[in-house]
A protein has these predicted regions:
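Eukaryotic short linear interaction motifs
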Residues: 36-38, 49-52, 108-110, 118-121, ...
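Short, solvent-exposed beta-strand-to-loop segments that form ligand-recognition rims
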Residues: 116-131
Length: 148
């Protein structure tokens, strides 16, 4: 059963049954990365600890060899696909408030941060409606999540 449309100050990790994703669905995520963050990620999964992830968006501030990188990927049956890393800028900073919008479209996801288009990620795993869980994990304090 789908829960509330607005969730304020949820704990991290945050796992929520948002109902099926579909073209036109928008997810608004506001938050603040930690003071010395390693990474945080946003995932659309088929179950709370899903073996299938339609989309992961992993903001890596200082993780392994990665510095200020955004990794996008999909996972099928616990196997990750090919990473996408190219973006024109890294919109996050430690302790800096952000507002993110993720729009589900027919062909893929579009992500904007602080009113600026950031990236697109084409759908790899279908059908979309089997992905009902949003997971946010890592070095971030979420102030609000909203679904529309």
């Amino acid at each position: 059963m789908m829960m509330a449309n607005v969730i304020n100050n949820p704990p991290t990790p945050f796992v929520h049954n948002m109902g099926p994703i579909h073209p036109g669905k928008m997810i608004f995520i506001n938050g603040i990365p930690g003071a010395n963050p390693s990474r945080f990620n946003i995932n659309f999964e088929d179950t709370p600890d899903g073996p299938n992830t339609a989309f992961t968006c992993d903001f890596r501030f200082n993780f392994g060899y990665d510095r200020n990188v955004i990794v996008r990927n999909s996972m099928q049956n616990n196997n990750w696909g090919a990473e996408e890393r190219a973006v024109s800028y890294f919109p996050m900073a430690p302790n800096a408030y952000f507002e993110m919008i993720i729009l589900v479209e027919q062909l893929g996801f579009k992500v904007a941060v602080n009113n600026n288009h950031l990236l697109e990620y084409k759908h790899i795993l279908l059908p979309l409606d089997k992905f009902t869980f949003l997971r946010i994990d890592g070095d971030v304090r979420i102030t609000q999540v909203r679904f529309q």
